[in-house]
Amino acid sequence: MVNATFDTAAIAAIQALIGKTFNGYTYSPVAAGAYGNILLHIDGTAYELRCNQSPLTVGNETEDIACLSINMHTGDFEPMAGEVITTESVEQIIKEICIIRDAVTRADGVQLSMDMAIIIKTQNAEYMFSRDVWFSEFITISNNGDLDSVYPICKAKSGWKSDESEDVIIKRTTIRL
């Protein structure tokens, strides 16, 4: 099993954000999101959400798999791509945080577990920061907590197939923190 998921410490840190004020987020706009990193401002503290490729052993090969991570951030925001920096204000209490996880089983039997999105739910809105294809470092930003409407499983499957004869099974689950 290949794990491209938040570790236990990251899950605990994310869960600790519930009940705090989501002040907003800072990013360098690229299409409908950001390339590589976003700053989440929560109760006056900055947390950097990153989507970076990491070399992982997948079957008999090493593949660069994009993985989500989150860490406290100090200093100026340095976007991985882009020069324009935008800050979106939210100023709402976090009621719930969800992580969307895909369990992938490839035709060759290799299994992967990948965190695909983090959804921050406030009293008035949902803010989803999601990734798509397994190698992409792009983070899509949307005000809807439905990953299937942004990146459906059929699209995720096509990203794993080298030809149409290959079968890929993807099970998507929501982890409520």
Where are each of the predicted segments found?
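Surface-exposed, interaction-prone regions used to assemble/regulate multi-protein complexes
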Residues: 1-177
